[in-house]
Design a protein with these regions (language model features):
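Double-stranded RNA-binding/processing signature
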Residues: 41
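C-terminal catalytic subdomain
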Residues: 101-104
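A common structural junction motif
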Residues: 67, 106-116
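Scaffold signal of the M16-like zinc-metallopeptidase fold and its non-catalytic homologs
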Residues: 76-81, 108, 135-165
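Non-catalytic beta-strand/loop surface segments
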Residues: 1-38, 49-99, 120-128, 142, ...
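Short beta-alpha connecting loops at secondary-structure transitions
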Residues: 89-90, 113, 158-162
Length: 197
C-alpha cells in the first residue's frame, strides 16, 4: 500500500494557451475523476466510450460528421491507484476556432449532465466492452497483464468480476458522475495553437 499525499481538490478552472510550431490547432480538456478502485470508475470508462468509441459515438457523430467542427476528437480516461483524469482532445476543422470547438464539447457534456443516457445506447456500449473483454482474454499476454494489474490493486480475485461491474452501471449513475466531474471549476483547458509567423 502506497502512502503518497493526494493532490488537493481543484476549486477553479485552469487554462493555458500555448503557441508552437505545429501544423494544426488542438484542444485538450481534462476533468478530475476517481481512482480505479472506486465504483464510479466504471461509469467514467463507459462515458468515455459513449462519447468517442466508434463511428456512432456522440462526439464523432455530432461534432465530426454532422456539424463538422472537428476533424478528429477522442475521449479517454487515465487513472490507476491514484485519482485519474477524464480527457477530451481534438483537432478543430479548418476555420473553426478553439473557442467554438470548446463550446461544442461543453454542449455535449451538458447534455450528459441534464439528460439520462438512453438505455439502448448504454446497452450498446456495454455489449461492445464485454465483447472486447472476452476476445481480449483469448490472448495470454492480455490475461497476464490484467492479472498483474489486479494484483497491483491488491485484488487479483476480482479480475473475473470486471464485466459485471461494467454491466451494473446505470443511466442514473452516468448522469450523476457527469454532473460531479464536468463542472467548470473541475476542468483544465489547454489551447495548443499553431504559431503565426
Amino acid at each position: 500500500q502506497r502512502n503518497l499525499p493526494q493532490e488537493p481538490e481543484q476549486t477553479e478552472e485552469r487554462r493555458l494557451t500555448v503557441e508552437r510550431n505545429v501544423p494544426l490547432d488542438s484542444l485538450f480538456m481534462a476533468y478530475h475523476m476517481c481512482s480505479h478502485d472506486h465504483p464510479d470508475y466504471y461509469a467514467f470508462d463507459i462515458l468515455s466510450d459513449l462519447l468517442s468509441n466508434g463511428r456512432s459515438s456522440r462526439l464523432n457523430q455530432h461534432l465530426v460528421q454532422q456539424k463538422q467542427l472537428f476533424s478528429s476528437i477522442d475521449a479517454y480516461i487515465s487513472g490507476s491507484v491514484d485519482a485519474g483524469l477524464f480527457h477530451i482532445s481534438g483537432k478543430p476543422s479548418a476555420g473553426v476556432s478553439l473557442e467554438q470547438a470548446e463550446a461544442a464539447v461543453r454542449e455535449e457534456l451538458e447534455r450528459l449532465q441534464q439528460e439520462p443516457v438512453d438505455e439502448q445506447e448504454l446497452e450498446k456500449v456495454k455489449n461492445k466492452f464485454e465483447s472486447t473483454q472476452i476476445f481480449g482474454n483469448i490472448n495470454y499476454l492480455n490475461v497476464a497483464t490484467n492479472l498483474a494489474w489486479f494484483e497491483l490493486l491488491g485484488r487479483a480475485e476480482d479480475m473475473e468480476k470486471e464485466v459485471d461491474r461494467y454491466r451494473a452501471v446505470t443511466a442514473g449513475q452516468l448522469q450523476r458522475v457527469a454532473q460531479s466531474a464536468f463542472r467548470q471549476e473541475n476542468g483544465v483547458i489547454l489551447y495548443y495553437k499553431k504559431q503565426v509567423s
